[in-house]
Amino acid sequence: MIKVGVLGANGKMGTQTVATITAAADLELVAALDLGDSIETLKKSGAEVVVDFTHPDSVMANLEYAINNGINVVVGTTGFDSAKLAKVKELLAKNPKVGALIAPNFGLGAVLMMQFAAQAAKHFESVEIIELHHPNKADAPSGTATRTAELITDARKVANRPPMPDATTSALPGARGAKVGDVAIHSVRLRGLVAHQEVILGDQGETLSIRHDSIDRTGFMPVVLLGIRKVESHPGLTFGLENFLDL
């Protein structure tokens, strides 16, 4: 029985995670914390793994507490840049038995979409990303879109692809999206959406679209459970769920 704590327990992802952990026969929910609750409860409750679905502004402090107290972490909060990842590695180096999984997306289809897009990008002249989310999402572009763009940029470098052609002059700032690596990302925020992403690849005479749609947050839960069950056996930092899957 793995003892699990959840941070951001009252949020949309946190609420679903709490319900899923409670229903799992091999997991025990020992702490469900949200804004205003004491993080010390994690240690007092004996949590072995903590799942963080909080906010980019608070996730680093949560990680520091958990890692320094020997608690493995599964993080779905986005907003991790190279500086934050370096800080996490530094914390883990001082606590080498602790595992930390940071995942831009917990949807199996989303992970596969990122991998497929990176493979396809080696063979197409151009690629852009459109990510679509509900208007309460805290960040833009999404962590999934950022990670996808990084994987595509790396894949294109390995394949020695030339720069993407673009002779457009933008009449308004941001009209061509935000660049991550070589890839333009366009962020849409609309009521009624959950989490969606389309990668559009183009070359002479054809285009290829790779799209993933999260219709309901229950779709994330099987891979959240996978992370909880596997993180302890993967000490150090694991960035991206593809490292826990047979891809």
Positions of predicted regions on the chain:
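Hydrophobic beta-strand scaffold residues
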Residues: 29, 73-74, 99-102
